[in-house]
Amino acid sequence: MPALINPVKFMRPLSHRTKIVATIGPASSSVEVIRQMVDAGMNVARLNFSHGSYEDHATMVRLLRSVEQEMDTPITLLQDLQGPKIRIGQLPGGEKQLREGEKVSLVPVEIGDRHPGAVGIDYPHLATEAKVGERILLDDGLLEMKVVSIQDPEVICEVVTGGILKSRKGVNLPGLVLTLPSMTTKDKQDLEFGLSQGIDWVSLSFVRKGEDIHTLKQFLAERGHPDLPVIAKIEKPQAIDNLEEIVAVSNGIMVARGDLGVEVNPEKVPRLQKEIIRRCNVRAIPVITATQMLDSMIQNSRPTRAEASDVANAILDGTDAVMLSGESAVGQYPVKSVQMLRKIAEETEVGLHLVNNPPIENTETHALSEALVVIDGILDLKYIVTFTTSGFTSLLASNQRPSVPVIAFTPSEKVYHSLNLVWGIIPFLINEEFDTFEDLIQQAEVLLRDRKMVEKGDQLLIMAGIPTKIPRGTNFLKIHRIS
């Protein structure tokens, strides 16, 4: 028999099944804070390419990979592309007071210097696409204006809700279908850079239709990365209208509640969140719930009760992961924020019995994933164990939300990192030096015993496709007792 499986890396046993995504920023850019966040439960590091230089991001990637090696546990890198985000230009002095009832002129930033007193906006087609009476929302909807007249290139607005408008704040035009590309020139340049840094997932902002994801995947394929998993961020009304086609072609979905709540009104977001998560669960693709999960912890060391309930409800809805944005990027308590997400997840998952998701295809793999549910309900299992080259077997096992963690043995470093985003999965990166499938099981048992993850008498449910060295769907299910 060949030497025991040599695990290059493995993830430490989970105390929480719901994965934690943390945005990296000034508050979390030191080695010590990253270590503490990983210890606290961070699984995925989000790199927000709306901010920061390439030098900043390259430094963070090196830091994250070094901590990953040092702590011998995966840190998945998620590159979040800015997408066609419309923003206010630079304002004199950096800000402008908007008063209710005041008239404000919006002009393209390129000609702002020819219109003293006007506010520049980096969308040149506003005057030709806007309509009188349309709402224009600024700074995540905190400020609101209404279009009262159009004198190309100026759009004259009346301030409905005033306040301080700062440079580079976001602009939302909820009533308009805009002629924007799905990927901007900046996105393409940023993604080229991300690929050179070895990112594990990429998310595209302001997706409107399935074709947007096809465009991104074609871009990746042309650059030799056809298998890099892609997340579609759902934050536009058009995305809700085209949700089924977007979910069908994406590898994952993010419920981006910030812009979504501005575009469709906040009272609709809870229902939409549940529907988006349900669609993802049916398709067996991972879903992240994001934005303002613990927003008050940017300033405070404890969340509000409503925030704790919000996180718990996302988990009960069936989300794979919950995400921190400003809390971990610029907040005063990045480590405590991760700890709090973990604690809420642990408490919510106690006795959690999610509705099992029906198979979507009549295949051996889907049939076996259904059988997994029955066996899990009868036997006292320690783990579900999957052997996978593509990650699909592990995804299906996780999607059934079993009562025990799913261990995913894979020889692919890409799959190892991508599965680290998925609910309940503990990924192991192994080599392929084995003769028979029985050898593989035996060696996997030794590996788990060495890490004190199993003991004599524990039962494992093993899912795999055999022969293991031939790519194919899952066709094998075995109950294995630790000897």
UniProtKB/Swiss-Prot annotation:
One of the record's GO molecular function terms: pyruvate kinase activity
Keyword 4Fe-4S (UniProt): no
Binding site for Mg(2+): E235, D259
Binding site residues for ATP: N48, F49, S50, H51, R87, K169
Keywords: ATP-binding, Glycolysis, Kinase, Magnesium, Metal-binding, Nucleotide-binding, Potassium, Pyruvate, Transferase
GO BP annotation list: glycolytic process
Listed SUPFAM superfamilies: Phosphoenolpyruvate/pyruvate domain, PK beta-barrel domain-like, PK C-terminal domain-like
EC number, as in UniProt: 2.7.1.40
Cofactor(s) it depends on: Mg(2+); K(+)
EC primary class: transferase
Quaternary data: Homotetramer.
Family affiliation: Belongs to the pyruvate kinase family.
NCBIfam families: PRK05826.1, PRK06354.1, pyruv_kin
Protein name: Pyruvate kinase 1
Species of the source: Synechocystis sp. (strain ATCC 27184 / PCC 6803 / Kazusa)
Gene: pyk1
